A protein has these predicted regions:
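Universal eukaryotic N-terminal targeting presequences
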Residues: 1-5
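Primary mode marks residue(s) on the alpha4-beta5-alpha5 output face of response regulator receiver
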Residues: 6-60, 69-237
Length: 237
């Protein structure tokens, strides 16, 4: 069976001459890293460590219907693309989450990933949820071990939420988040920013099937460590 066709939609090409990741390092040095958080909120605080990665996430938020007739989060899955070089082209960097979300919404329902060939930026890893270390509930994971960091057993981070704030764009987009490391060596702090899409409908019929909702975001990760796969990356806004 032939693979399902992607929509006719063109991502802006990565800037020429800026390189692609090679084994053991990422594409671009970030220069001065800065994370710009929404004004008027106190739930998220600026990173205490150097920004090490900035990633474009393209995937799904997952939800289950409760007996109360409302949706509860059941985690998320996403591909993580290296957008380290886009800091050199602010017009693209500042809108890449919108460009990706437009393409992702146009993709047929049977297409579960846009893929690096469609996006045009290197795939670094995956975002998913795993059983929490306590054995109860689930925790978010950012994992490079199956893609850009094969053979690196600690090339992941399992995290816990520190805080969340409503996206500056409103309730149509999932919240911005700050998280902290629980396991792994990929990062000490993680931020979900520049979100597009992802929230569940307000109500559901108890007993109905789980749903998935498309979303995109930037993920900004910081670390004290000299990363095993990096030079440090760019600011997040």
């Amino acid at each position: 069976m032939a693979a399902p066709a992607l929509p006719s939609f063109s991502f802006p090409k990565p800037p020429s001459g800026l390189g692609k990741p090679l084994a053991g390092r990422l594409a671009c040095d970030p220069g001065a890293a800065k994370l710009v958080l929404p004004t008027g909120q106190t739930a998220l605080t600026a990173p205490t460590d150097v920004i090490s990665y900035v990633l474009l996430g393209v995937g799904f938020q997952n939800y289950t219907c409760t007996d109360a007739g409302t949706y509860a989060s059941a985690g998320a899955v996403a591909d993580l693309f290296d957008i380290s070089c886009l800091n050199k082209v602010p017009a693209i960097f500042n809108s890449i989450q919108d460009i990706a979300y437009t393409a992702w919404k146009l993709a047929p329902a049977n297409v579960k990933t846009l893929g690096a060939s469609a996006v045009g930026y290197p795939l670094l890893g995956q975002h998913f949820f795993a059983t929490s270390p306590s054995g109860t509930g689930i925790s978010p994971v950012w994992d490079f071990r199956a893609t850009s960091a094969k053979g690196k057993a600690d090339a992941f981070v399992l995290a816990a939420k520190v805080g969340n704030t409503t996206a500056p764009t409103g309730a149509k987009d999932v919240d911005w988040l700050q998280l902290k490391n629980v396991q792994g060596s990929l990062a000490t702090q993680i931020y979900r920013t520049d979100t597009r899409g992802g929230p569940a409908p307000a109500t559901c019929t108890p007993g109905s099937a789980p749903i998935t909702v498309k979303y995109t975001s930037k993920y900004c990760e910081s670390s004290l460590f000299a990363c095993f796969i990096c030079v440090r990356l760019i600011h997040c806004a």
